[in-house]
Amino acid sequence: MDMNQLFMQSIANSRGLCHPDCEKANNEREDYDASQHAAMVAVNLISSARVILKLDAVYTEYSAQYLVDNAGKEDNQGEMDQQSSQLTLQNLLQYMDENVWNKKEDVQGEREQPLTVKDCLECAFK
Protein backbone atom coordinates (compact mmCIF):
# COMPACT_ATOMS: atom_id res chain seq x y z
CA MET A 1 0.00 0.00 0.00
CA ASP A 2 1.20 3.45 -0.73
CA MET A 3 0.96 6.42 1.65
CA ASN A 4 -2.24 7.80 0.15
CA GLN A 5 -4.07 4.52 0.65
CA LEU A 6 -2.85 4.24 4.24
CA PHE A 7 -3.96 7.81 4.91
CA MET A 8 -7.40 7.22 3.39
CA GLN A 9 -7.77 3.98 5.35
CA SER A 10 -6.90 5.70 8.64
CA ILE A 11 -9.48 8.42 7.91
CA ALA A 12 -12.11 5.79 7.13
CA ASN A 13 -11.31 3.90 10.36
CA SER A 14 -11.52 7.01 12.52
CA ARG A 15 -14.64 8.48 10.91
CA GLY A 16 -16.80 10.07 13.59
CA LEU A 17 -14.08 9.81 16.21
CA CYS A 18 -12.22 12.79 17.51
CA HIS A 19 -8.78 13.06 19.07
CA PRO A 20 -8.95 13.31 22.91
CA ASP A 21 -7.35 16.76 22.83
CA CYS A 22 -9.96 17.89 20.32
CA GLU A 23 -12.78 16.53 22.51
CA LYS A 24 -11.31 18.27 25.57
CA ALA A 25 -11.10 21.58 23.71
CA ASN A 26 -14.67 21.17 22.48
CA ASN A 27 -15.94 20.43 26.02
CA GLU A 28 -14.10 23.45 27.41
CA ARG A 29 -15.65 25.62 24.70
CA GLU A 30 -19.11 24.32 25.63
CA ASP A 31 -18.43 25.06 29.32
CA TYR A 32 -17.29 28.58 28.44
CA ASP A 33 -20.42 29.14 26.34
CA ALA A 34 -22.64 27.89 29.18
CA SER A 35 -20.89 30.19 31.67
CA GLN A 36 -21.27 33.13 29.33
CA HIS A 37 -24.98 32.43 28.88
CA ALA A 38 -25.45 32.12 32.66
CA ALA A 39 -23.72 35.47 33.17
CA MET A 40 -25.98 37.13 30.61
CA VAL A 41 -29.08 35.66 32.26
CA ALA A 42 -27.88 37.01 35.62
CA VAL A 43 -27.29 40.45 34.11
CA ASN A 44 -30.77 40.49 32.56
CA LEU A 45 -32.38 39.39 35.83
CA ILE A 46 -30.56 42.08 37.77
CA SER A 47 -31.57 44.75 35.25
CA SER A 48 -35.19 43.59 35.31
CA ALA A 49 -35.27 43.53 39.11
CA ARG A 50 -33.86 47.07 39.26
CA VAL A 51 -36.66 48.30 36.96
CA ILE A 52 -39.35 46.43 38.92
CA LEU A 53 -38.07 47.81 42.24
CA LYS A 54 -37.91 51.28 40.66
CA LEU A 55 -34.18 51.61 41.31
CA ASP A 56 -33.74 52.43 37.61
CA ALA A 57 -36.23 54.35 35.48
CA VAL A 58 -35.43 52.36 32.34
CA TYR A 59 -34.05 48.90 31.62
CA THR A 60 -30.27 49.12 31.56
CA GLU A 61 -28.25 46.67 29.51
CA TYR A 62 -25.22 45.80 31.60
CA SER A 63 -22.46 43.66 30.17
CA ALA A 64 -21.39 40.45 31.86
CA GLN A 65 -17.93 41.99 32.31
CA TYR A 66 -19.48 44.95 34.19
CA LEU A 67 -21.14 42.48 36.53
CA VAL A 68 -17.85 40.66 37.16
CA ASP A 69 -15.91 43.89 37.68
CA ASN A 70 -18.43 45.29 40.18
CA ALA A 71 -19.19 42.14 42.15
CA GLY A 72 -16.75 43.04 44.91
CA LYS A 73 -17.39 43.61 48.59
CA GLU A 74 -19.72 46.44 49.53
CA ASP A 75 -18.39 49.57 51.20
CA ASN A 76 -21.07 49.44 53.90
CA GLN A 77 -21.40 46.53 56.27
CA GLY A 78 -24.25 44.24 55.36
CA GLU A 79 -26.29 42.22 57.82
CA MET A 80 -24.02 39.16 57.55
CA ASP A 81 -20.89 41.30 58.06
CA GLN A 82 -22.01 42.59 61.45
CA GLN A 83 -20.46 41.11 64.57
CA SER A 84 -23.81 39.79 65.84
CA SER A 85 -24.20 37.63 62.72
CA GLN A 86 -20.78 36.01 62.91
CA LEU A 87 -20.57 32.49 64.30
CA THR A 88 -18.59 32.78 67.51
CA LEU A 89 -18.72 30.88 70.77
CA GLN A 90 -20.10 33.95 72.53
CA ASN A 91 -22.90 34.38 69.96
CA LEU A 92 -23.71 30.66 70.14
CA LEU A 93 -23.96 30.74 73.93
CA GLN A 94 -26.12 33.86 73.78
CA TYR A 95 -28.46 32.18 71.27
CA MET A 96 -28.66 29.01 73.38
CA ASP A 97 -29.43 31.07 76.48
CA GLU A 98 -32.15 33.11 74.78
CA ASN A 99 -33.82 30.43 72.67
CA VAL A 100 -33.09 26.95 73.99
CA TRP A 101 -32.27 26.68 77.68
CA ASN A 102 -35.07 28.94 78.94
CA LYS A 103 -37.69 27.32 76.75
CA LYS A 104 -36.65 23.84 77.87
CA GLU A 105 -37.32 24.83 81.49
CA ASP A 106 -40.70 26.27 80.48
CA VAL A 107 -41.70 23.00 78.82
CA GLN A 108 -40.66 20.99 81.90
CA GLY A 109 -42.75 23.32 84.05
CA GLU A 110 -45.80 22.78 81.85
CA ARG A 111 -45.48 18.98 82.06
CA GLU A 112 -47.39 17.70 85.10
CA GLN A 113 -46.07 14.14 85.14
CA PRO A 114 -42.56 12.93 84.36
CA LEU A 115 -41.86 11.36 81.01
CA THR A 116 -41.39 7.59 81.20
CA VAL A 117 -39.59 5.14 78.92
CA LYS A 118 -42.97 3.65 78.00
CA ASP A 119 -44.17 7.08 76.82
CA CYS A 120 -41.04 7.48 74.69
CA LEU A 121 -41.42 4.03 73.11
CA GLU A 122 -45.10 4.62 72.35
CA CYS A 123 -44.24 7.91 70.68
CA ALA A 124 -41.38 6.35 68.70
CA PHE A 125 -43.48 3.49 67.30
CA LYS A 126 -46.62 5.44 66.36
Swiss-Prot record:
Induction: Target of TAS1 (trans-acting siRNA precursor 1)-derived small interfering RNAs in response to temperature variations. Highly up-regulated in seedlings exposed to heat shock. Expressed in seedlings, leaves, stems, inflorescences and siliques. Its main location: cytoplasm. Keywords: Cytoplasm, Nucleus. GO terms for biological process: heat acclimation; response to heat. Mediates both basal and acquired thermotolerance. This is Protein HEAT-INDUCED TAS1 TARGET 3. It comes from Arabidopsis thaliana (Mouse-ear cress). The gene is HTT3.
